[in-house]
């Protein structure tokens, strides 16, 4: 018997085509949720077509979470599918540069901030109006 604790809940997961994001998506799907999954890796997104847990409750989108205009486009697409969401899982992140600060490349540092900080801001800002419509989202 499937645990229905997420039955018909609508959940957005960033960076969901592999790793922790994919594992989270599988759990949500197995519990009856609709999952709106995005990832920058189109190849990994396409591999999901063959996965047994992937069904009519999964909507996949290619999106660079660190690009505000792509996040805006993503939410426009999601808004066409649903007028509310129940949860946002900000999963996107990269391992930042390591080593001596003196040798740190500014471009690598800026990319890390863009992905690990700004993307979460973009997603959360766009998700809030949809979560408010659910009246019990998180």
Features from the language model and the residues they span:
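Active-site loop of short-chain dehydrogenase/reductase
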Residues: 9, 84-85, 131-138
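The beta1-alpha1 cofactor-binding region of Rossmann-like NAD(H)/NADP(H)-dependent oxidoreductases
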Residues: 43, 61-73, 106
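Conserved NAD(P)H cofactor-binding loop of Rossmann-fold oxidoreductase domains
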Residues: 92-97
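A short, exposed helix-loop element centered on a Lys and neighboring polar residues
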Residues: 124-125
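Canonical Rossmann dinucleotide-binding motif of NAD(H)/NADP(H)-dependent dehydrogenases/reductases
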Residues: 5-36
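Conserved glycine-rich Rossmann-like NAD(P)H-binding loop of the short-chain dehydrogenase/reductase
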Residues: 31-47
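Substrate-binding pocket helix/loop in short-chain dehydrogenase/reductase
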Residues: 99-101, 108-110
């Amino acid at each position: 018997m499937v645990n229905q604790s997420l039955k018909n809940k609508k959940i957005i997961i960033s960076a969901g085509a592999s790793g922790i994001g994919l594992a989270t998506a599988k759990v949500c799907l197995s519990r009856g949720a609709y999952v709106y999954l995005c990832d920058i890796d189109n190849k990994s997104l396409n591999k999901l077509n063959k996965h047994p847990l992937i069904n009519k409750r999964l909507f996949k989108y290619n999106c660079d979470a660190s690009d505000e205009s792509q996040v805006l486009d993503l939410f426009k697409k999601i808004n066409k599918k649903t007028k509310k969401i129940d949860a946002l899982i900000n999963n996107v992140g990269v391992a930042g540069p390591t080593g001596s600060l003196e040798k740190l490349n500014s471009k690598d540092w800026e990319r890390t901030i863009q992905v690990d900080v700004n993307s979460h801001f973009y997603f959360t800002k766009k998700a809030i109006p949809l979560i408010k419509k659910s009246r019990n989202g998180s």
